[in-house]
From Swiss-Prot:
UniProt function note: Aspartyl-tRNA synthetase with relaxed tRNA specificity since it is able to aspartylate not only its cognate tRNA(Asp) but also tRNA(Asn). Reaction proceeds in two steps: L-aspartate is first activated by ATP to form Asp-AMP and then transferred to the acceptor end of tRNA(Asp/Asn).
GO biological process entries: aspartyl-tRNA aminoacylation
Record's protein name: Aspartate--tRNA(Asp/Asn) ligase
Subcellular location: Cytoplasm
NCBIfam families reported for this sequence: aspS_bact, PRK00476.1
Enzyme Commission number, as recorded: 6.1.1.23
Location of the region described as Aspartate in the Swiss-Prot/TrEMBL record: 211-214
Similarity section: Belongs to the class-II aminoacyl-tRNA synthetase family. Type 1 subfamily.
The species this protein was found in: Chlorobium phaeobacteroides (strain BS1)
Site positions for Important for tRNA non-discrimination: H44
Lineage per the UniProt record: Bacteria, Pseudomonadati, Chlorobiota, Chlorobiia, Chlorobiales
PANTHER family: ASPARTATE--TRNA LIGASE, MITOCHONDRIAL, ASPARTYL/LYSYL-TRNA SYNTHETASE
GO cellular component: cytoplasm
Amino acid sequence: MSAVAGTADSLQNRFRSHFCGRLHTEFENKTIAVAGWVHRIRDHGGLIFIDLRDHTGICQLIIQPEKEELFRKAEALHTESVICVSGVVVRRSEETVNPRLASGEIEVVVEDIRVESNASPLPFPVADELQTSEELRLKYRFLDLRREKIHENIHFRSRLISEVRRYLEERSFMEIQTPILTSSSPEGARDFLVPSRLHPGKFYALPQAPQQFKQLLMVSGFSRYFQIAPCFRDEDARADRSPGEFYQIDMEMAFIEQDDLFEILEGMFKHLTEKMSNKRITQFPFPRISYKEVMNRYGSDKPDLRIPVEIEDVTELFVNSSFKVFAGNTKEGNCIKAMVLKGRGNESRQFYDKAERRAKELGSAGLAYIQYKEEGPKGPIVKFFSEDEMNDLKERLQIEAGDVVFFGAGKWERTCKIMGGMREYFSDLFELDRDELSFCWVVDFPMYEYDEAAKKIEFSHNPFSMPQGEMEALETMDPLDILAYQYDIVCNGIELSSGAIRNHRPDIMYRAFGIAGYEKAEVDKRFGHMIEAFNMGAPPHGGIAPGLDRLVMILRDEQNIREVIAFPMNQQAEDLMMAAPAEVSPLQLRELSLKLDLPKEEKKEKRS
């Protein structure tokens, strides 16, 4: 294990005088005391070698056979037992130096062993990073956390939080804690509810985010706020999302514009990348891409810019096409998108069949394509195109022999998303550089969208964002053309955070909600406390809240968020180690004035 930043070389107490990973030749011939876990035990022809591990690393102990009592103690030890040892530091011979260990130039000749805790047989080995089921790892998380990789992940997370605090405090941010027990919020996910004993029938909610509190702090006169904030959302797990609980670097600033916030966050990510990793940022300052452009070019509002493929709009080439599918879409005002894979025109039929299956999973009726072989274009739809169309397409997309072009056609947003899904699917064809961090800002999100099912205009994203153009835009523009001061920060296809310049003016807020069909009375009922505060003097303000867990994932090259959280839940939102969630006693339910009304299936299971 790597040494822990900021750890002293020595710590005098009855358990130890030094740390295992900090012993080196400077301590040769000195008597020291170390304590930790038995990582490995090896018996080599009369000598017993023990690798002793603490949170700084490993050192090698030697027990000599002439010390019979010590030898018997060592023979009886199990791996992962906790021992305290005193002994003399000696230099290793040149041929036995272990360059993999920080303490690899020395070893400790043991003079005394005290067993603090003898370990029982383990459900899985700690020393060897063998494949272990996730269920076992989560049930015995305290053991799993001893393993080198995940142990270092948690150390890394701790150091990163310290760096975040230092960076923000140097820029006049103040760390302020906001309530955990609060009221239900409009963030969008399901709340975790907490019943009130003192107020029967009423419930607190765990915060999905400290959104309203941090805005009220700006109204309270605090200029720059941050918090390593726990957030609670009752939503399903994903590889990059933990069910139930997660942490974010929550930030808010008064009297700022969008560019001010971008400068702060870009600087922080650059600092963390350079200080905490060997990765490199592709472009600094981070590129800014409008929502419309990012969907047109990448088919996703969280694009991985490392993928060397872009989507092209070729609608105008097929306005009067002899291919009825394309011509019909252009007449209906739909779009036609194309994506070129360089050098993949000679793949097997299986390659194209698999790609079509993926397109259908994404919601497409199929996947049209043209292969450009040396002898000419081939494919199921080539026969439908005129020679002029084929030539125009080749020139427009700069197609060469050996390439293949995939097509999508239909309504703009749906077609963009399907093509974006295919772009992501084809990313496996490329060796993406894991040490490259391709950040970007996605900006200029639409304020509103049309809900086809409800047949009405709805907010597209955050209803509390300031519309670009403010009141004038709301009063003079088509709602579907209004843009919001809202932004996402994305890295390598992972959305780290959304943020916005807030709507701090009640008159604009009422008007914005009115366009989405909300009456003033309903707005007052749901957000009256915010509007009341804004009516008493609210500064322009904005913020963002990058996901801490996701940031650690990226910097540590982890594919699953559970690898960077000390005690995560499983995908079913269960804590296998603590057996949560769990039933509670009838007395606890009575104290909370609660009765259970379980689903019928569950009731049957209880009776059986």
